[in-house]
């Protein structure tokens, strides 16, 4: 999942950079630059949160920030409610987005 996200991120940034070169108005350029900034900020935050989760003992975690929620997938052999609460707290503190967290455990 992380490799797929990295590939999509790279493709999206490349596409937006091409659009930026072709943009004719300053308003259009500003809109594209804002979109690039939004994508980069979310990507950096996803990676930071995954690193924090690894530090808390969840090295196999995937975080995806969406417009209306944050999806988290954690590979864990023995999930329980306490682990879920701890993971959600870490994600909420790290992202500081105020978005609901959708947590899924996989074994």
Placement of each model-derived feature along the sequence:
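Bacterial N-terminal Sec-type targeting sequences
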Residues: 1-96, 100-107
């Amino acid at each position: 999942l992380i490799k797929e996200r990295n590939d999509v991120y790279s493709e999206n940034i490349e596409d937006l950079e091409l659009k930026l070169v072709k943009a004719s108005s300053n308003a259009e350029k500003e809109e594209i630059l804002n979109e690039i900034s939004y994508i980069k900020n979310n990507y950096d935050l996803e990676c930071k949160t995954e690193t924090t989760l690894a530090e808390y003992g969840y090295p196999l975690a995937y975080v995806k920030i969406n417009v209306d929620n944050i999806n988290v997938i954690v590979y864990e052999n023995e999930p329980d409610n306490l682990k879920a609460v701890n993971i959600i707290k870490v994600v909420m503190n790290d992202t500081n987005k105020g978005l609901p967290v959708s947590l899924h455990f996989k074994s």
